[in-house]
């Protein structure tokens, strides 16, 4: 059985091809989803990839969350479908209310593009089951608005419920509160992170193949469901 993973393309999306390739490398079938699609074509999971959807006008992800396809993604996520938001996709998921908090301008007010070490904090999500808790992975980070912020109550809730999925190791590149690089929904089916695992799937072209574990994980989750 091959799981079908939808990869959304908005105007301004940059990383849909890389996300689709990561799905294929993990053994899944990547299905293209257009922002105007009124259905999800029977996919088992969805990836909202990185880029600059709608030119980042208003706020990053603020317009994309109103795209027809996102209405279907929200419904599917509420029904338990695994959804991953990467970089701009993380911003979209926050705007859509699937994840708490917001991503704001980096603390240094500059675009960051470099490889970053992340610590895997939670392995019970649909997207991280292949990792060991406490493992450190190397993946690229490229964003200008990647600073995760939320109220202290929300941050305490995320920490207390084990929903901080990834944390930056060493220095905090963008000033994210508590060094948070990625979080999950309460049921662990929806995950958002700012760094790019899809760019770390082949050692030849990336800093590592550490990101591939996320795509293996969701295929495991879908097949075992």
Curated annotation (Swiss-Prot):
Listed CDD domains: GATase1_FGAR_AT (cd01740)
Catalytic reaction equation(s): N(2)-formyl-N(1)-(5-phospho-beta-D-ribosyl)glycinamide + L-glutamine + ATP + H2O = 2-formamido-N(1)-(5-O-phospho-beta-D-ribosyl)acetamidine + L-glutamate + ADP + phosphate + H(+); L-glutamine + H2O = L-glutamate + NH4(+)
One GO process term, biological-process aspect: 'de novo' IMP biosynthetic process
Keyword DNA repair attached: no
UniProt keyword list: ATP-binding, Cytoplasm, Glutamine amidotransferase, Hydrolase, Ligase, Nucleotide-binding, Purine biosynthesis
UniProt GO molecular function: ATP binding; glutaminase activity; phosphoribosylformylglycinamidine synthase activity
Pathway participation: Purine metabolism; IMP biosynthesis via de novo pathway; 5-amino-1-(5-phospho-D-ribosyl)imidazole from N(2)-formyl-N(1)-(5-phospho-D-ribosyl)glycinamide: step 1/2
Principal subcellular localisation of the protein: cytoplasm
Enzyme Commission number, as recorded: 6.3.5.3, 3.5.1.2
Domain of life: Bacteria
Record domain Glutamine amidotransferase type-1: where: 4-225
InterPro entries listed in its UniProt record: Class_I_gatase-like (IPR029062), PRibForGlyAmidine_synth_PurQ (IPR010075)
GO cellular component: cytoplasm
Localization per Swiss-Prot or TrEMBL: Cytoplasm
Active site: 87 (nucleophile), 196, 198
Entry-linked PANTHER family: PHOSPHORIBOSYLFORMYLGLYCINAMIDINE SYNTHASE SUBUNIT PURQ
Function in brief: Part of the phosphoribosylformylglycinamidine synthase complex involved in the purines biosynthetic pathway. Catalyzes the ATP-dependent conversion of formylglycinamide ribonucleotide (FGAR) and glutamine to yield formylglycinamidine ribonucleotide (FGAM) and glutamate. The FGAM synthase complex is composed of three subunits. PurQ produces an ammonia molecule by converting glutamine to glutamate. PurL transfers the ammonia molecule to FGAR to form FGAM in an ATP-dependent manner.
Binding partners and assembly: Part of the FGAM synthase complex composed of 1 PurL, 1 PurQ and 2 PurS subunits.
Name used for this protein in its record: Phosphoribosylformylglycinamidine synthase subunit PurQ
Gene label: purQ
């Amino acid at each position: 059985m091959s799981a079908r993973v939808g990869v959304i393309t908005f105007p301004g999306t940059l990383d849909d091809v890389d996300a689709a390739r990561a799905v294929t490398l993990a053994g899944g079938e990547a299905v293209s989803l257009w922002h105007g699609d009124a259905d999800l074509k029977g996919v088992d999971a969805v990836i909202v990839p990185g880029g600059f959807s709608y030119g980042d006008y208003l706020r990053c992800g603020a317009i994309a969350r109103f795209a027809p396809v996102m209405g279907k993604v929200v419904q599917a996520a509420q029904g338990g479908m695994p959804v991953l938001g990467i970089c701009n996709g993380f911003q979209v998921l926050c705007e859509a209310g699937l994840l708490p908090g917001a991503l704001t301008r980096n603390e240094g007010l500059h675009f960051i593009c470099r490889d970053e070490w992340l610590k895997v904090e939670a392995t019970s999500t649909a997207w991280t089951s292949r990792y060991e808790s406490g493992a450190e992975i190397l993946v690229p980070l490229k964003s200008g608005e990647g600073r995760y912020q939320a109220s202290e109550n929300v941050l305490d809730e995320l920490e207390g419920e084990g929903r901080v999925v990834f944390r930056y190791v060493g220095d905090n590149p963008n000033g994210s509160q508590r060094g948070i690089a990625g979080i999950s929904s309460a049921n662990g089916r929806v995950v958002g992170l700012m760094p790019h695992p899809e760019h770390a799937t082949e050692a030849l072209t990336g800093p590592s193949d550490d990101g591939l574990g996320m795509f293996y994980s969701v295929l495991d989750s879908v097949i075992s469901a």
